[in-house]
Amino acid sequence: MTTKLERRLKIKAGVRGKISGTTERPRLTVFRSNKQIYAQVIDDTTGKTLAAASSLKLDVKAPKKEIAAKVGELIAKGAQEAGVQTVVFDRNGYLYHGRIKELADAARNGGLKF
């Protein structure tokens, strides 16, 4: 029987085999811990992070979904400042639900296309 972490890592490996960020369309990846949420826009051809945002930068007491939405807005703004309009969304093995969905929707509303 596999644990939740083993299941997520197995899904992550399968997704990362299919998804790769390019210079024209970098990868927007998300990491979720119990308390924080992080997002990065990565160009996999050079291995460089073009933009990053996390809930650590926010000094807001709010529900986790609202904080995830604010991180989505921040990553969209940072990506546009780096000259990125379209991305490939990498949910990193997490279900597209809850905080991950809120972050993705906020990034879309912020102007990113994926």
From Swiss-Prot:
InterPro entries: Ribosomal_uL18_bac-type, Ribosomal_uL18_bac/euk. CDD domains: Ribosomal_L18_L5e. The keyword Cytoplasm does not apply. One of its GO terms (molecular function) is 5S rRNA binding. One of its GO terms (cellular component) is cytosolic large ribosomal subunit. Belongs to the universal ribosomal protein uL18 family. This is one of the proteins that bind and probably mediate the attachment of the 5S RNA into the large ribosomal subunit, where it forms part of the central protuberance. This is Large ribosomal subunit protein uL18. The gene is rplR.
